[in-house]
Amino acid sequence: MDRGEKERGAAGMTIVRKAVRSARLQVRPDGSLRVVAPPSFDVEGFVQRNAAWIEERRRDLDRLAAEGRGREGMLLLSGRFYHLVPGARFAVDDARGTVASPSVPALQRNLSRMLKEEVSGRLEACPDLAGRWSGRIAVKVQRTRWGSCSTLGNLNFNLRVIALPEPLREYVVVHEAAHLRELNHSERFWRLVGEHYPDHRAAEAELRRYWVIIERNRVWSEF
């Protein structure tokens, strides 16, 4: 796959030059710009022509990220912000609002373990979706999606899922488990999801909001 050539643009902008028919503009969750354009395309003019749209998009992202503003240096876990403190072992103290860990790698390992155990339990609780499922569960650090289901029936979950409130974690598991029966996003798939999580449209909107918050969080960016 041709990934194109990257070049530096103005501050907060990445330009990717590749053989495409038309330019594409993306405002990332952190507010920076990514432009994919043909080799000789006038990127600066393109950005200027879309300045109003860019500012509107940035305002939308700022609104979505409002809950995390001023708490970017705290760990978002189970929908709550915790102060990270050094400790000989991993420990969550809800009363004090702290999470102790000896290192970032240790923190990542323990969060991964927590999520994997929770996913296993949730799959056991919905046998009509998982059925006689014999695939594997993997927890990974991903930058584009909350989870995925392979054609072999293996379920992959983004470590970021553990940052979500409990109802949204449930929804992500239901969503991916439904793919064990429907490997698409067809009407049948959404009907199946709705049988187990009726308010899935609201959940999708909340997932978008939390994605922006996590993208702007310095602790999560270390994983």
Language-model segment annotations:
Residues 176:
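Walker B catalytic acidic pair
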